[in-house]
Amino acid sequence: MASANTRRVGDGAGGAFQPYLDSLRQELQQRDPTLLSVAVAVLAVLLTLVFWKFIWSRKSSQRAVLFVGLCDSGKTLLFVRLLTGQYRDTQTSITDSSAIYKVNNNRGNSLTLIDLPGHESLRLQFLDRFKSSARAVVFVVDSATFQREVKDVAEFLYQVLIDSMALKNTPAFLVACNKQDIAMAKSAKLIQQQLEKELNTLRVTRSAAPSTLDSSSTAPAQLGKKGKEFEFSQLPLKVEFLECSAKGGRGDAGSADVQDLEKWLAKIA
C-alpha cells in the first residue's frame, strides 16, 4: 500500500516534471560539471531575488508609525501637530487614535500615525495589537521631567525594545525628546546616556531574576551584548534620538518645533 500511495503522489503535479528534471540533470553532468555549477549559481540568485521581493512587499505593506510613551509625555499633542500643524488641548486617553499622514518628500508617500495610550495598564496591550503593522516606533520622552521619571521611562523602553527585537520587520525606532521649549529640559544626548545606564541596570537585574520558564517556553531575548555595558548601537534595530517641542517656544499659539521629526518620517516612509 505504501508503494501504491507513493506512485499516486508522484503522478501528481510534481511527478509530471520529474522526468524532465532528471534528464536535464543528467545532460548537464555529462556535458560539463562546470555547467551544473553555473546552473546552481543562477538558481541561487533567482531564489535570492524572490526572497528579497517578498521582504520588500511585506515592508511596503507596513505603513504604521506607533507613537508610544508615558502619560503626559506630550505624544498626543505631537501627533496632532504633525497632522494639523495646530495646538490643541489634550487629555489622557484609554484608546488609540489613528490618521493618515502625508510625508514631506518627493515621492508623495503616506503613513498611518497611531497614538497609543500611555497608561501603564494599557500601553503594552495596545502595542501587542498594532506591532505587526509597525513600520516605525516613535518613543516620546518628556525631557523636562526626565530626571525624576528616568526609571519609569527606562522600564517601558526596555519592554518595547525587547518586544521589537522579537519582530521580524525590525521597525525604525526613534526616541523623540519632547518639550525642549522648557528651560529645564534635558538634551537628547544626556537622555541617551542616562537611558543606556538604566537599561544596563535593568538588563542585569532581569538576567539575575529566577527563571519561571518551563521546558516548552522560549527564553527571553537578550538586550545588547552579553558581558558589555549596554549601548543602543548593540541592538539589531537602529535607535535614533532627536529633540522636538510639540507646544512651541511661544506658548499655546506658538509654532511647534517638529521639523526634525518630519524629516525623520519622510526618511523612513
Swiss-Prot record:
Parts of the chain that traverse the membrane: 35-55
UniProt superkingdom: Eukaryota
PANTHER family named in the record: ADP-RIBOSYLATION FACTOR-RELATED PROTEIN 1
Residue positions, PTM Phosphoserine: S110
Localization (cell): Endoplasmic reticulum membrane
InterPro entries for this protein: P-loop_NTPase, Small_GTPase_ARF, SRP_receptor_beta_su
Family: Belongs to the SRP receptor beta subunit family.
CDD domains: SR_beta (cd04105)
Organism lineage: Eukaryota, Metazoa, Chordata, Craniata, Vertebrata
Function: Component of the signal recognition particle (SRP) complex receptor (SR). Ensures, in conjunction with the SRP complex, the correct targeting of the nascent secretory proteins to the endoplasmic reticulum membrane system. May mediate the membrane association of SR.
GO cellular component terms given for this protein: cytoplasm; cytoplasmic microtubule; membrane; signal recognition particle receptor complex
GO molecular function list: GTP binding; ubiquitin protein ligase binding
GO biological process: protein targeting to ER
Residues the entry annotates as binding GTP: 69-77, 90-93, 118, 246
Matches recorded under Pfam families: SRPRB (PF09439)
Subunit structure: Heterodimer with SRPRA.
Intrachain S-S bonds: none
Name of the protein described by the UniProt record: Signal recognition particle receptor subunit beta
Residues found modified as Phosphothreonine: T212
UniProtKB keywords: Endoplasmic reticulum, GTP-binding, Membrane, Nucleotide-binding, Phosphoprotein, Receptor, Transmembrane, Transmembrane helix
Bilayer topology annotation: Single-pass membrane protein
